[in-house]
Amino acid sequence: MKDMAKVYDIRIEDFNYPLPDERIAKHPLAQRDECKLLLYKGGECSEHVFREIPELLPADSTLVYNNTRVINARLRFRKPGGGALIEIFCLEPLAPADYALSFASTDGCEWLCFVGNSKRWKEGKLALELTVDGKPVTLYAERNGQSGNAFRIRFSWSDGAVTFASILDAVGEIPIPPYLNRNTEPSDTEDYQTVYSHIEGSVAAPTAGLHFTERTLADLDRRGIRRRELTLHVGAGTFQPVKSEVIGEHEMHTEFISVTRSLVEDLLNAPGKIIAVGTTSVRTLESLYYIGVAIHDGDEDPLHVKQWTPYNYKGGLSAKDSLKAIAGYMDANNLTHLVGSTQIIIAPGYEFHVIDGMVTNFHQPQSTLLLLVSAFVDGNWRSIYDYALDRGFRFLSYGDASLLLRQ
């Protein structure tokens, strides 16, 4: 068991650093894989270009990335008669709760949403006129209750042959990060997606993957680096600031995860290092370990990892035995996909079980993502970030990348 009190009492102000606005990349480079890459290996930093990553990864590595695709989650309505602007930000489906079924709906669906200017919309339907495949369609939104600071929104529309996915594609906007301090631009439609994204459901991109190009992927294949994928749908909670003084008082957001039976097998038989692309892949792979532990221990609800589960676990099960438990569970239940959720917080004091390295961007001060990086590099995050700041690296979602390796 980890020293729970020490983790609980981690002060978020200890993870602050000066980040001038001019160091926040507002747009990506024209050629994604020409960005800078910081390599952290053996406690030392060195500067490279991202396209060199196939040569920098250890031989026989398995690279695991998040195949989620960002949806056009932001909808802008106006109250009747040219009234107040009401912005609806779709977070996750409620009915149907399955992402694919909700996107395929033709007779309405319900989502959990943030609502901008909600005080000006207490009741009644909002209507939005749009065009889908050349045909006029009216989208309606109606409040159906509240959950914390979010709302249950019932969507319906006038044409029963049109899917909700088509509506979002036609009139929704890509929700770029708020810290970019700019409106969504047409270029973001392509720029804010990874080249390998194909499972729709995120409201934010797994940004470490934005640097990969078809050229980089081909070079990885030529070098014999295995490429595998998983799914974590990134929620708006990824931008949620830590408002408490200590981590123990911060509540992590819950996110949907999905892995295939073949990925579990590939992890079991990986000949070399397992490298996660992005913190979302890190959180999914490390959550898998605790799902396997729960299955092994016979828990009634093994597919949902709680925030503090890792720090309450007494230990003992190897990563291989955990993955074998998952494989057995999937085979026994005839599952090709394991679908669950995770609320895991990875902070200094966390013991990594699955990953040996990660590709990640440079994160906001006082964020849970910075805590995750610190946990992986044994507290040396500040020397890494000082190196990046001193050498002109660009920060946050559209910024440069790092490859963090353990010896």
Model-identified regions with their sequence ranges:
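Surface-exposed, charge/polar-rich loops and edge strands
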Residues: 2-407
